[in-house]
Amino acid sequence: MSVTFEGQIDSVLGGFYCLRGYATFRELSSYSKADPSYQRDLISEHKNEMRDFLKKGSYVFFPEIILSYSIKTKNNLLLSQIISANGRNTPLKINKNKTTLTLKDEEKLDRIDGNHRLEAFEKNKGILDNFKVPFCIILLDGSEDDLKKKNIIFHNINFKQIPLSKEKSLAILFK
């Protein structure tokens, strides 16, 4: 069975085209997969914490789940050419007010950030099935550099930020 993701498309810093929108946990979980070449091993304790946080339902908020999709064309068009042609002859359809990406039956998006959240959902199906969550699908051009790009994006998301100290975190919570 195919699925269609809908949202807005634009170019962001670094020249990546992104499709941003909302989908249910079920859709994102069912139509995406973790790539073991850059994803960290799941920490059971963290997965359980995430499950409890999601089930509690109080102040539940988190940033977009970041995924990627490689658009491969017969004549190796550049992504900018595909966008300029409104996605013609690709799974991407670009209109003035919305863009859709339709995946074929067995096709999956690659998870870049949000794997722990999606894994927590998979352990609690039924409870969170229809909760909508924000997503960002980074569009790639299907070149042999796609894996390198995903590795770098994963690294930049997970290792470039300055961790919040426990003391600072508690101070913010109890102000």
Label every PLM stretch briefly:
Residues 1-102:
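N-terminal extension/subdomain marker
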Residues 61, 67, 71, 79-175:
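Basic- and aromatic-enriched surface patches that contact anionic nucleotides/nucleic acids
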